[in-house]
Amino acid sequence: MIQVLLITICLAVFPYQGSSIILESGNLNDYEVVYPEKVTALPKGAVQQKYEDAMQYEFKVNGEPVVLHLEKNKGLFSEDYSEIHYSPDGREITAYPSVEDHCYYHGRIENDADSTASISACDGLKGHFKLQGEMYLIEPLELSDSEAHAVFKYENVEKEDEPPKMCGVTQNWESYESTKKASQLNVTPEQQRFPQRYIKLGIFVDHGMYTKYSGNSERITKRVHQMINNINMMCRALNIVTTLSVLEIWSEKDLITVQASAPTTLTLFGAWRETVLLNRTSHDHAQLLTATIFNGNVIGRAPVGGMCDPKRSVAIVRDHNAIVFVVAVTMTHEMGHNLGMHHDEDKCNCNTCIMSKVLSRQPSKYFSECSKDYYQTFLTNHNPQCILNAPLRTDTVSTPVSGNELLEAGEDCDCGSPANPCCDAATCKLIPGAQCGEGLCCDQCSFIEEGTVCRIARGDDLDDYCNGRSAGCPRNPFHA
């Protein structure tokens, strides 16, 4: 049973006496200081997790009480999630961290139907929430008082005086010839109910971004996790589940030549994915995060309609803003191009939606109707195969009940009847020495050797192979 952590916030709001403060998100002129105080109410005998599945916060904004409901984002990581960095001698070092008890949440404000929230609870509360049509950010204050947080509107963050930042995709650039203009579409309400799709993301951080954050891999990792948490939330409107499959940090040197020319860098990254990356990681769409300043104020670029293509299912994004959400909007924008979307035009009646060509001063987390039409057409015309595969059963989390043939929260294996020799029936944990309990790539409690066929192809499709690192049968990245 999912436990609910009730947190009452004793809020003290102090008007700031001064010109501004500097936070990780930027310089602020107007903000509120809040002091959260946790009061936990768990049922008798319940075991408290480090990060609860559900949380509730009560506090005030502009003197008015609000109740923030949060639920852990269960779909954030793929079952075979890996983190990769490099040793000084260039060796690839891969880790498979346990991410079940992570600290990333989605939520809403009570009695506000249009509200949303994306919050990290890793080190205090950090993220954003939408309240009465306005976006607020919250983050810890780096003061001696560790409980102090700042709450502020996005519009109150001082903006740099620089030309508008924009996407580098030109209309019809590298698009499939059969992608139609939104004005030509006749999409019925039935079609608008998008079929469920699943995108496994690979994020690759270049050496420039690694240097930008002083070689602090932990800080970069948390930042990327927050980005994916935001992307996951934005893509729900399209009935797309986005999970992070691999995070690779180029800690020693760049593995491609990252140039100021966005088109050149994108071409090089796509070629590298096709020839190198797909041979060693399982993912559907790869993005390069870079600190490089591209020519022409460009902050991102991606092939239109490239999803599932070995060379074109890619995007490049500049880490252009201290606020995670703003960069996440750009990442979602570029992935939108891969899903067949063009930029919003005047007829779309939305100059601040995700697919706007120029980054808005008030970034939106919504897709326009034009974008939805483009996406529907892309699915109809091309039916990209790599995003059809549903998450493995370990992505399904519910109340732990032994023997229901699902891996539940806290279970390593299903310990129902008949008895699983790899599974301790008392704890639903793997027995000592066991790597797995079941799955197409599990045999006698061990992962099956890499390269073994685990799913035979149908028709003109391709066989799927075990990777030697997980019990699931990963989707062949070269599927059409």
Swiss-Prot record:
Pfam families given in the database record: Disintegrin, Pep_M12B_propep, Reprolysin
Domain of life: Eukaryota
Residue span of motif Cell attachment site: 458-460
SUPFAM superfamilies: Blood coagulation inhibitor (disintegrin) (SSF57552), Metalloproteases ('zincins'), catalytic domain (SSF55486)
EC nos: 3.4.24.-
Keywords, alphabetical: Cell adhesion impairing toxin, Disulfide bond, Glycoprotein, Hemostasis impairing toxin, Hydrolase, Metal-binding, Metalloprotease, Platelet aggregation inhibiting toxin, Protease, Secreted, Signal, Toxin, Zinc, Zymogen
Main localization of the protein described in the UniProt heading: secreted
GO molecular-function terms, A-Z: metal ion binding; metalloendopeptidase activity; toxin activity
PANTHER family in UniProt: ADAM A DISINTEGRIN AND METALLOPROTEASE DOMAIN (PTHR11905), DISINTEGRIN AND METALLOPROTEINASE DOMAIN-CONTAINING PROTEIN 28 (PTHR11905:SF32)
Cystine bridges: C308-C386, C348-C370, C350-C353, C413-C428, C415-C423, C422-C445, C436-C442, C441-C466, C454-C473
SMART domains: DISIN
The Disintegrin domain, residue ranges: 399-480
UniProt-recorded name of the protein: Zinc metalloproteinase/disintegrin
Signal peptide: 1-20
Additional remarks: The disintegrin belongs to the medium disintegrin subfamily.
Cofactor binding description: Binds 1 zinc ion per subunit.
Quaternary data: Monomer.
Active site: residue positions: E334
Cofactor(s) this protein cannot do without: Zn(2+)
